Amino acid sequence: MTTVQLQKTNQPPVKAPRGSYWITTFGCQMNKADSERMSGILEYMGYYPAEEELKADLVLYNTCTIRDSAEQKVYSYLGRQAIRKRSLPNLKIVVAGCLAQQEGESLLRRVPEIDLLMGPQHCNRLESLLNQVDSGQQVLATEEQFILEDITTPRRDSSFCGWVNIIYGCNERCTYCVVPSVRGKEQSRTPEAIKSEVEDLAKSGYKEITLLGQNIDAYGRDFQSQNKEASAQITLSYLLKYIHDIEGIERIRFATSHPRYFTKELIDTCSELPKVCEHFHIPFQSGSNKILKNMGRGYTIESYKNIINYIKSKIPKAAISGDAIVAFPGESETDYEQTLSLIDEIKFDHVNTAAYSPRPNTPAATWPRQLNEDIKVKRLREINSLVENIAKERNQRYKNTSQEILIENINPKDSFQLMGRTRTNRLTFFPRSLENGVENKLGELIKVKITDVRPFSLTAKLL
């Protein structure tokens, strides 16, 4: 599980300075987008980025509970801040996100030094909740509520690629997953609000946006309770068309998709819209229909293959990535081999893999036939080896080809290189300047020629 820290900004505070802040983000892209929003609120309130975590006047941990390892890391960080608070009583400790929602009062009892504990549905209430903290209260905010439309401009972690939440929550009931219980029911933002945010990004010079949702292709389903006619019309396909022609935006991505809602209409739309990038992340989780049924995923391997085959027929150069869980309770050797076979058959460009981790208050955590750690380690090692080999094989198709790259950053391991991604989401490294000394700038779209490939990245030269 990675930890992502937001970078500093030079924007002045909107209100009188109140002190420095530090945000550490654990987990998924949704959390990263939430952290950007909360950072924007903090800076509106008068907070400014700290030089480092241990010098901050306010620390905020935006947490993840998808696996136990992420939880344990949060507890370690909290322990360090609790010690700080003994000598710095004015230090504010904020815990947000899925772990906060899941643990609630028990987390406050475990770490009483926490000033504010809030679930992911409360990100936009951060200012009012911190005002309660300033009045001397210890605040717990985990009750379910309607998502407030965005009230403060996020402080983006990138100046070129922007996250845009379009749907919050999840209505699925996968037997291994805590997300529905911690992120609440699906709530779609209106197309008008989304378009307005994307237009603001375009005016600020952003070239690429990634639309985000726990099940992004379920966008618009919840509108049915308000207006059945509107629900039938407002889908992810509709939204992509609605925002596609915004001037300045050159690339559109979306994640994460659920196979149940990935329709032919959506694939057709993506094939017709030139700004939609040719990369689709569609988790499959297992290659065994038995395991998929036990997981409560709501589709079969056959229906999943139909989706992938249709994508390949309509968008032949598309890159496909997915997620897989190994060692789910009751997973036999045959079930596991079916997962390996599926990966080998589809030839995924990348697969995010994980060994099953029992999560509190999920059905699968209490089932018999839990697999031991030795099996988990063995299967995870084997599947990762297969994924890496196929990824390198797939990347061979890029060698000696010209690719469009959006320059995102300087290579942190080599200051003479820049880095960016192809439209198919391949991370690519290339020199900072042409032979004549002209240097490319961050945020530019350029053409490069791929000279070397590795399993998960490419090397290129400038054209």
UniProtKB/Swiss-Prot annotation:
GO molecular function annotations of the record: 4 iron, 4 sulfur cluster binding; metal ion binding; methylthiotransferase activity
Pfam annotation, one family: TRAM
Keyword entries, A-Z: 4Fe-4S, Cytoplasm, Iron, Iron-sulfur, Metal-binding, S-adenosyl-L-methionine, Transferase, tRNA processing
Its EC number(s): 2.8.4.3
Reactions it catalyzes: N(6)-dimethylallyladenosine(37) in tRNA + (sulfur carrier)-SH + AH2 + 2 S-adenosyl-L-methionine = 2-methylsulfanyl-N(6)-dimethylallyladenosine(37) in tRNA + (sulfur carrier)-H + 5'-deoxyadenosine + L-methionine + A + S-adenosyl-L-homocysteine + 2 H(+)
Chain residues that bind [4Fe-4S] cluster 2: C170, C174, C177
Cofactor note: Binds 2 [4Fe-4S] clusters. One cluster is coordinated with 3 cysteines and an exchangeable S-adenosyl-L-methionine.
Domain TRAM, first and last residues per copy: 396-463
Main location: cytoplasm
Localization: Cytoplasm
One CC-aspect GO term: cytoplasm
Domain MTTase N-terminal: 19-135
Function: Catalyzes the methylthiolation of N6-(dimethylallyl)adenosine (i(6)A), leading to the formation of 2-methylthio-N6-(dimethylallyl)adenosine (ms(2)i(6)A) at position 37 in tRNAs that read codons beginning with uridine.
Assembly: Monomer.
Family from the record: Belongs to the methylthiotransferase family. MiaB subfamily.
Protein's recorded name: tRNA-2-methylthio-N(6)-dimethylallyladenosine synthase
Gene (UniProt): miaB
